[in-house]
């Protein structure tokens, strides 16, 4: 697949092969990661990368865009069909760019943005001080209830009435429960705010019809195209409002982006078609079944699951009672070729670089074909490591690490992904 690269730049090729082996022989449990199909990767690596195409279909600033127009229109039409939306912009380079585009289409710098606190499951772009969203807008945050660790909608309503935000954001990067979009829209309407839903994490579940579709309720919906959607790295914006759509288009180009990445847009089109298949719907159902099975199995091994479980593809493990940090367990699991990420939890007392928890997701292992029985194996490995972390650097007994690595490789070999590409 990469013969020309191998002959022209062996240094990059060797690094690529090392990453390929890491992905093939390791357990990927980062909730925001997945394995794109070869079709998606072929489109992303295609000759579409050669073409500049500032503007939109039929309204370009460069000549020679007739076939670029075809592929971008196809991507837009498929996105609209997939999510039952009237309008779609497929040009955002990322989820963060999509969020910036949506914000600037709905409000001005200095206006009030209301989003979920990062430490309670939100995202950097939902108002974190270090992010553009926190720098450009007056931010008011809501979180989860201390007891249930789920969203208290009455409290969200109280905060919204007090703050009178211009935009309310629903969605997050580490919230494991289904969100009541209807309730959020009622709150937004009550205070005269726009409702924006960031469905970057659960878009694949929405596409498969096993999660409520926020397009029915939100003024604007943003998403990434990787994660559960299993496409290339990129973003999209959806709306049913023609005026908002016009504003979004102006903000994306020429407002915050120049030439779109048409090779990635082509790959988005491929991913959207894949997401319309019956196989994809069954895949998403299995993602959730695996997530529930893995969280339940870990809970049975005395690891505390935030909110007591999950409705989606991800969940948080609170490590406070084990007296280890998320940073330490992330490193310890990494030594065993199991990849997770440290994550803040509700009532967090440590810095975001250390944290009291880890986030776990099942999209990637489910893409490999793993099911509930394999989740039991994975839970046993995680629990064994969690109970044997020696220090803050995440060191564990070398013999134990080798034993678990061997089990990881054995499991991965039963469910190959890109094995035929390894040299």
UniProtKB/Swiss-Prot annotation:
The modification N6-(pyridoxal phosphate)lysine is found at residue 227. GO terms for molecular function: glycine hydroxymethyltransferase activity; pyridoxal phosphate binding. Pathway: One-carbon metabolism; tetrahydrofolate interconversion; Amino-acid biosynthesis; glycine biosynthesis; glycine from L-serine: step 1/1. It catalyses: (6R)-5,10-methylene-5,6,7,8-tetrahydrofolate + glycine + H2O = (6S)-5,6,7,8-tetrahydrofolate + L-serine. The lineage of its organism: Bacteria, Thermotogati, Thermotogota, Thermotogae, Petrotogales. It is found in: Cytoplasm. This is Serine hydroxymethyltransferase. One of its GO terms (biological process) is tetrahydrofolate interconversion. The gene is glyA. Keywords: Amino-acid biosynthesis, Cytoplasm, One-carbon metabolism, Pyridoxal phosphate, Transferase.
């Amino acid at each position: 697949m990469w013969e020309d690269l191998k002959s022209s730049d062996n240094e990059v090729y060797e690094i690529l092969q090392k990453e390929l082996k890491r992905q093939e022989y390791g357990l990927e449990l980062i909730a925001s990661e997945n394995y794109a199909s070869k079709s998606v990767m072929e489109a992303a690596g295609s000759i579409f990368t050669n073409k500049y195409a500032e503007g939109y279909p039929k309204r370009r600033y460069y000549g020679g865009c007739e076939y670029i127009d075809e592929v971008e229109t196809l991507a837009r039409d498929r996105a609209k069909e997939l999510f039952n939306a009237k309008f779609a912009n497929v040009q955002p380079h990322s989820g963060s760019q999509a969020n910036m585009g949506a914000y600037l289409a709905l409000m001005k710098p200095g206006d009030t943005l209301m989003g979920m606190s990062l430490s309670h499951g939100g995202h950097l772009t939902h108002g974190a001080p270090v992010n553009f969203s926190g720098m450009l807008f007056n931010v008011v945050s809501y979180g989860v209830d201390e007891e249930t660790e789920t969203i208290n909608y009455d409290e969200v309503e109280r905060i919204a009435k007090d703050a009178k935000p211009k935009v309310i954001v629903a969605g997050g990067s580490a919230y494991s429960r289904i969100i009541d979009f209807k309730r959020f829209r009622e709150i937004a309407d009550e205070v005269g705010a726009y409702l924006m839903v960031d469905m970057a994490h659960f878009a694949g579940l929405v596409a498969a019809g096993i999660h409520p579709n926020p397009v029915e309720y939100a003024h604007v919906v943003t998403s990434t195209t990787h994660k559960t959607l299993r496409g290339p790295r990129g973003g999209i914006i959806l709306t049913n409002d023609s005026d908002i759509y016009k504003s979004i288009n102006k903000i994306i180009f020429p407002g915050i982006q120049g030439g779109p990445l048409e090779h990635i847009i082509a790959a988005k089109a491929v991913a959207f078609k894949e997401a319309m298949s019956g196989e994809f719907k069954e895949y998403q159902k299995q993602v959730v079944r695996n997530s529930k099975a893995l969280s339940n199995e870990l809970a049975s091994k005395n690891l505390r699951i935030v909110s007591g479980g999950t409705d989606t593809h991800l969940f948080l493990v609170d490590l406070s009672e084990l007296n280890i940090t998320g940073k330490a367990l992330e490193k310890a699991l990494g030594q065993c070729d199991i990849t997770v990420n440290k994550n803040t939890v509700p009532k967090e007392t440590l810095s975001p670089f250390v944290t009291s928890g880890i986030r776990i997701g099942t999209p990637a292992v489910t893409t490999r074909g793993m099911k509930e029985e394999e989740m039991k194996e994975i839970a046993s490995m995680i629990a064994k490591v969690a109970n044997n972390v020696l220090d803050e650097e995440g060191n564990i007994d070398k013999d134990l690490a080798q034993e678990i690595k061997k089990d990881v490789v054995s499991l991965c070999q039963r469910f190959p992904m890109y094995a035929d590409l390894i040299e």
